Structure formats: C-alpha cells, structure tokens
C-alpha cells in the first residue's frame, strides 16, 4: 500500500479494546470472568504471572507517536479513554494500534489494528471499532477489536498558523502546554559569558536606537550579590572555584570572589541559597580526588558546601515510576539533569516604598562552571596568562594542560534573563523539582506569605511599551523529576502534558520548536550543540531506522517547510551553526556515532530538498535553502604571548593543533530565531535526549516583542533582530546589508561564500594572519541528489584522524541520540 504524507496534527483517542485473549497464558482464551479470577488469585498470592497488564500504542510508519497507561485488572475489556495530540510529519500507509501485555522486561504483543492513512486526509472525524489482527495481519478467534477516534488536520489547511509568523500582539503562544504565555515581560539576550567593551558593532533598530549587548556573567554576579531573600540554582554542573568577573576594565566590588565564596557569603547574610546539581552517578573517589565521567565536579561542589548555610543537593536523574527496569537503569546512568537556571529576588525597576522585591530568572545554555567563560574573540592562546590561566578547558586533546600551552577550547553559548510573570514560571519549575528530589520541602520560601516583601507575578512593562516582551516557558521533564504532575491521563492532557506507559511527560520544548517552524515565513537561524533526529525518515543504510528511536520531528519539520516553499515558488533559507564535532576526542566511539547520526539527519533533509527541486525543475544548489556551519579560530603568534613550561608529545593531535595554531570554537548554544521576530533560548539540544521529555531534563523560553513583528507592512527590527545581527557580526567579522534579508538568495550565497573562504583559510597549511571571521562551512559536500559526503581531500578534521561524517558504532543509540 502506498505511503502517504501526514504533515499536521492528529487528534487521536483510544477508548477501549474488547474480546482480548492472551496467547502467553494457559488461561489466555478462557472466559473473561474466569481469567480475572485466576489472575487476581495469582496476583494476591504472588504466584504465576499475576494480573495481565495491558496498554496500547500508536505508530505512524517507523515511529511510535503515542502510548496509553497500563490497565491492570481488565484482561478482556481494558478501558483507556486517553486523548493524544500528535504532531506528525510522517509517511505511512496506516495508523497502527498495537495492544500489548506489559512484562517485567519488555512486552508481549496481543495484536494490531490498522486504519489506512488515506481515510484521514479528508480531515473528517472518524470513530471506529477496528479488528485486532495477529502479527501476520490475520484475524484472531473471538474477534477482538479496539475502539478509536481520529481526526487529522493538515498544516496546509491551518489558515491561522502555517506560515503566519507571530501574527500580532494577541498571538496566544504555543497551545497544549503546561505554562501559558505571559505578556508584560522584559528579556535580556546574551551571546557568550561576557562582552568586552571592544566588541561594539553599530546595529540600527526600529525607533532610531542601536542594539546594546548584554553581559551575562556580570548580570548573574550582580543578581546574586544583590539578592536579599532567595537564590535558587539548577545546573548540569556548578563549580565553586570559578570567578564570574574577569574583565580588568569592568571590575566590581567583591568581583574577585569565587562563585562558592559568593554563595556562602549570601547564605551567611540570611539569604536562602538552594542548589539542585545533577548527580553524575559515575563519580568515584580515587587517590583523594573525586572524578566523574563527565567532569562535572558534582561531588566536589557538594563537599564544598557541606556544613555551610548553602543547601546543595546532588540530584540524580531518577526515572519515572512507570518505566521498565531496563529503561530505568538506562535513565539513571546515561541521562542527566540539564537545566541551567538562576532565580533570585531583585529590586523593583522603579523603586517602591517598603522595599518591595520581585523575581528575576536566568535561563539558557551556560552552566556556572569551568570552561564556560569566553568573549566574542574566542582566543586560543592569548588569554592563557589572564582570564583562562586558572580555567583552561580542553577535553578534546589527551593530556592538554595550560602548562603545555594552547589551544584551549573556546566556548560559544547563548543565555537569557527574564523579568516579569514568566520569571515566576522558572521559579515554579525549581519548586516542583525541589519538592520531588530536594529533600526538606520546608527550605523553600513560602512566597505567598512574603507578598509584602516579594510582589506576586505581575507585568514589569505595559503591553503598549515598545520594548515589552511576551514570554512562554517550555520544558522537557517527567514525573520522575517533577512534583505535582497529574496522576490521570485526563488531567495530564488538560495540563498540556503527555501521558505514557504509566508516566507523565512535559515535552513542550519540542512542541515549541515545531510550532515556530510551522509558523515561519522567511527564514530560520539555529545555533545548537547537536543536530540529529527524525530517524524514522533516515535511509536504511547499514541500520534499521526503527531501532534508533531518535523520533523528534524538528529536522523533518524544517525540510518539509523548505519543500513547501519550493513548491510555492517562494524563497526560504535555514542556517544551522554546530560545533565541528561533539565535545571529546573526535575519533572516539561516542563522537563518531553522533557524527554518523548527524550525517544521516543532514542527508534526509537534503534528499527532501533535492526531490522538491527536481520536481519543480529548478537547477539550484541545495545549500541555497539549507546550509550548515561550524565555528573555528586561528591565531598568529604575538610577541609577549604566554609561554608554557612544557609541550605536548610530538605527533599527537595536541601537538598538531598547537603547531597549526587552530581549533574549533565549541558551539554550546541552544537557540532558534524565526523571521527576526520569535526566539527560543534554553538548555535543550536538537537531539532525542533533549526533546524526548523522558530523558534529559531541560528548560527553555520562547519570546517575542509585540511591537516588533513582520505585520502591517513593517519589518521586525527589535531586540531579536539586533541579537541575530550581533551574532553574525561575531561569527563573520563584519556586517552587510544583505544580512538584513536572510531569506534572500543574495544573503545565503554571500554567507556561504564567506564561510567557504574562512574554511579554506582555517584548513590551509599556511598561516599569515588571524582568521577574519569564525564562521566556517561545515566540511561536507552536498550533491544535487542530496547525498552528504566529505569534502574532496578532507576526509578527516584538521590535525586529527577523525572522519568528518562519522562512523557507525556499537554504543546504544539511547546514549548517543
């Protein structure tokens, strides 16, 4: 049967199944009353197999898109009555409903039912009892059925969403989410941990002003220093020995204090200081030192604060109670808490009598730990005797140390500060997590009782203020990490949550990306640490795509958006900035596996584009529509530069990179800008770990300025536009009028040409000057058929023997996707 595209939203309800039999049990086909008696007897005495535990799933092609809770006591006629709101971008012949019996390890298939996709394309609601068939699609005796209700809404028919952008100030935000959109906020956007005075591009904004860059770690230092009641932090890593203020021209009183000293001082002043730090369960103690596979310093941080007024809780990523034993172990040892937030009380923007305070929150990609401090210059060698002498970070090169010299690994990241009602949502996320895993719940301040000191959630800007923001908070998290999730699927659905096999998930970050991509008009600009997913659409090239389970939709949504624009004869461009390779030795098994997934993702997208171009008989380079970049730096040696006492071993990658004086700039950003009017910033990578909801815990915000939209003949020229232009100035070393229209062919070809040139300079055997810009073409070749291969003569990353396009590995995809 032909596979048809379902691109839109599928509203599905699984009501019940009837006349089921279980082939794995001797009583599996006995009358229902007898089966319930036998199974109940076994269950109560702990004998035999106990009660049959049934659940149902929904599949589209090679992707599982829905799963009910487990029903324990109805072996014949289980009733679920569960509703699913499913974003879909899948080719499939049928919607497949499977009924399964849960086991301690795995599950037993009872049977499957099929509804042809072609019946959904009209958009009419369908309610039907479908025959449940065996694995060979044969009828089963007793005639079991499953009762379902379905309605599909194609994106092309969504007149109020598809391609509409942020359609106006009343745009309500992403639907079906736990947190609503909050108007009347203020947002500050940050590129990197610090911006020196020397980085000052003049970027015009609407109204005649110019864009002003924020300074993240300065603002975090000030916020912590000025807090009077509370400081709440979450982090993948929090390292007590870093200093936040390192720019000698912008010192502050107490700026030489370490983060640990600063937090202890505030706690001693009576401020409630609570930390939730991910507990890396690989951490061990050896020879008096504490080590962990991920080098997060979690045990050191906990020891540092032990016995002080700071309460630091090491927080393991516990699985939701509904997980199987195997899945629970995978989550506990392979999955992380990845949220990065700082929440403080802060003075009012306009002083009020009585010393009233408000809540301010920081959200983004920057952990308060070592290796994160950097500026837009991303030096490899020139800060080794100043800002990075005590903070030398280079995990990609074995044996690297400041005593042996650079290159250090530069760090590019994006963060945000939220003021107004949405800042309280970040606080509420912390409180939910603390109540689940923080221990003493009484340590959380009762802010309702402190309303005379800290005002309740309220706007900090009037809606008609030209600089006001509307902000919505999104998460990836489940009931294993978050207190207070509804216990029933019905209540979970009303709260914008997804219920599964006895677990409840918030995966609104993925929903936010999908929603923003679908509404995009002209262009998308992405910076992210990873870019892989939509594995259901990968080619079966040495793998079984259905085994990979990197099912999130973001790459496929992007390629289908581009295809739609090609078919409509309209321009659209997508720019994606990635690290050259994931952090770690580039030839290692984990890095190579991720690069392989990344290449498969790129190839899936470029194949979609190539097919669309061929169908329209357009002779164009696929990179005119979708183009990938990485960041790198290369520096000539200056007089007076830091001279290390030692040197790396000859012939190593370290020695080669030091001699060539080059290295990648590590892209750790997690950001998407759409049409210069909407932005998502957070901790979530574009991979399954971050977008799943049941794997790494994440947090992000989506925001826009109602007075700076592409509406009523105007072009968005607010803070988001200024931020993108500032990022492009950082990466390209210049500004150009073409950059004002990123969707234009002139712009994308100019940027590609500059990045090609910068890559050639980066990869060259000669070095005469510093690189004029950091944006490098990602070193792959894209054919007109959409195939992705290495560049001619560039099989390996410079100074390594690590293949650019990766190699298939043996590590579990659950870990590397």
Swiss-Prot record:
Pfam families: C2, PLD_C, PLDc. InterPro entries: C2_dom, C2_domain_sf, PLipase_D/transphosphatidylase, PLipase_D_C, PLipase_D_fam, PLipase_D_pln. Belongs to the phospholipase D family. C2-PLD subfamily. This is Phospholipase D alpha 2. C2 domain is a calcium-binding fold, and the binding promotes the protein association with membranes. A lower affinity toward calcium can be anticipated for PLD alpha due to the absence of two potential calcium ligands. One of its GO terms (cellular component) is plasma membrane. SUPFAM superfamilies: C2 domain (Calcium/lipid-binding domain, CaLB), Phospholipase D/nuclease. Residues 1-130 form the C2 domain.
């Amino acid at each position: 049967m032909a596979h048809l595209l379902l691109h839109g939203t599928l509203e599905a309800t699984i009501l019940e199944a009837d006349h089921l039999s279980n082939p794995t049990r001797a009583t599996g086909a006995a009358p229902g009353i007898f089966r319930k008696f036998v199974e109940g007897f076994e269950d109560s005495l702990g004998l035999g197999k106990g009660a049959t535990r049934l659940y149902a799933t929904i599949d589209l092609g090679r992707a599982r898109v829905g799963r009910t809770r487990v029903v324990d006591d109805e072996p014949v006629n289980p009733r679920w009555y569960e509703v699913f709101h499913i974003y879909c971008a899948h080719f499939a012949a049928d919607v497949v409903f499977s009924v399964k019996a849960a086991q301690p390890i795995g599950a037993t298939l009872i049977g499957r039912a099929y509804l042809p996709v072609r019946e959904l394309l009209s958009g009419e609601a369908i309610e039907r009892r479908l025959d449940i068939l065996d694995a060979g699609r044969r009828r089963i005796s007793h005639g079991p059925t499953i009762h379902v209700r379905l309605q599909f809404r194609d994106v092309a028919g969504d007149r109020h969403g598809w391609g509409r952008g942020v359609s106006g100030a009343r745009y309500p935000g992403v639907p079906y989410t736990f947190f609503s959109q909050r108007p009347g906020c203020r947002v500050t956007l940050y590129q990197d941990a610090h911006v020196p005075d020397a980085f000052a591009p003049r970027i015009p904004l609407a109204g005649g002003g110019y864009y002003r860059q924020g300074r993240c770690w300065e603002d975090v230092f000030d916020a912590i220093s000025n807090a009077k009641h509370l400081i709440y932090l979450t982090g993948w890593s929090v390292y007590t020995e870093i200093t936040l203020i390192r720019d000698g021209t912008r010192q502050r009183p107490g700026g030489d204090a370490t983060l640990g000293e600063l937090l202890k001082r505030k706690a001693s002043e009576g401020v409630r200081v609570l930390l939730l730090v991910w507990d890396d369960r690989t951490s061990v103690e050896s020879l008096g030192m504490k080590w962990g596979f991920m080098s997060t310093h979690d045990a050191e941080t906990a020891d540092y604060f032990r016995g002080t007024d700071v309460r630091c809780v090491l927080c393991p990523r516990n699985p939701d109670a509904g997980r199987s034993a195997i899945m629970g172990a995978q989550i506990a040892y392979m999955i992380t808490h990845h949220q990065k937030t700082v929440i403080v009380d802060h003075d009012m923007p306009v002083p009020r009598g009585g010393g009233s305070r408000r809540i301010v929150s920081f959200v983004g990609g920057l952990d308060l730990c070592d290796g994160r401090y950097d500026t837009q210059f991303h030096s490899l060698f020139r800060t080794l005797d100043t800002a990075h002498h005590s903070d030398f970070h280079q995990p990609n090169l074995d044996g690297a140390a400041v005593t042996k010299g650079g290159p250090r690994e530069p760090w590019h990241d994006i963060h945000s500060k939220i003021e107004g009602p949405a800042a309280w949502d970040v606080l509420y996320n912390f409180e939910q997590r603390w109540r689940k895993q923080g221990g003493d719940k009484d340590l959380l301040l009762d802010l309702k009782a402190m309303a005379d000191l800290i005002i309740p959630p309220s706007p900090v800007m009037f809606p008609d203020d030209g600089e006001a923001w509307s902000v919505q908070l999104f998460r990836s998290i489940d009931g294993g990490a978050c207190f207070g999730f509804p216990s029933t699927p019905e209540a979970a659905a009303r709260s914008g949550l997804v219920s599964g096999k006895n677990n409840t998930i918030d995966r609104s970050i993925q929903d936010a990306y999908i929603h923003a991509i679908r509404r995009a008009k002209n262009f998308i600009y992405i910076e992210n640490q990873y870019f892989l997913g939509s594995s259901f659409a990968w080619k079966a090239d040495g793998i079984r795509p259905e085994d990979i389970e990197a099912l999130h939709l973001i790459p496929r949504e992007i390629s289908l958006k581009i295809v739609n624009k090609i078919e409509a004869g309209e321009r659209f461009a997508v720019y994606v900035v990635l690290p050259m390779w994931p952090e770690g030795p580039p030839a290692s098994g984990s890095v190579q596996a991720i690069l392989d997934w990344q290449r498969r993702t790129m190839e899936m997208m470029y194949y979609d584009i190539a097919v669309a171009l061929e169908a329209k008989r357009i002779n164009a380079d696929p990179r005119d529509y979708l183009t990938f970049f990485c960041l790198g730096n290369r520096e000539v040696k200056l007089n007076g530069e830091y001279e290390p006492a030692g040197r790396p071993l000859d012939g190593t990658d370290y020695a080669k990179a030091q001699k060539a004086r080059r290295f990648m700039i590590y892209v750790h950003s997690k950001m998407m800008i759409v049409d210069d009017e909407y932005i998502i910033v957070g901790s979530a990578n574009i991979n399954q770990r971050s977008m799943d909801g049941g794997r790494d815990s994440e947090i992000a915000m989506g925001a826009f300025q109602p007075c700076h939209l592409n509406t009523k003949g105007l072009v968005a020229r607010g803070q988001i536009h200024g931020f993108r232009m500032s990022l492009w100035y950082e990466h390209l070393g210049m500004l150009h009028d073409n950059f004002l229209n990123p969707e234009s062919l002139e712009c994308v070809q100019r940027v590609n040409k500059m990045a090609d040139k910068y890559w050639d300079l980066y990869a060259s055997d000669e070095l005469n000057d510093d690189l004029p810009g950091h944006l490098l073409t990602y070193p792959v070749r894209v054919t007109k058929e959409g195939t992705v291969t290495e560049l001619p003569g560039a099989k390996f990353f410079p100074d390594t023997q690590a293949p650019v396009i990766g190699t298939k590995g043996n590590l579990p995809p659950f870990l590397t996707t």
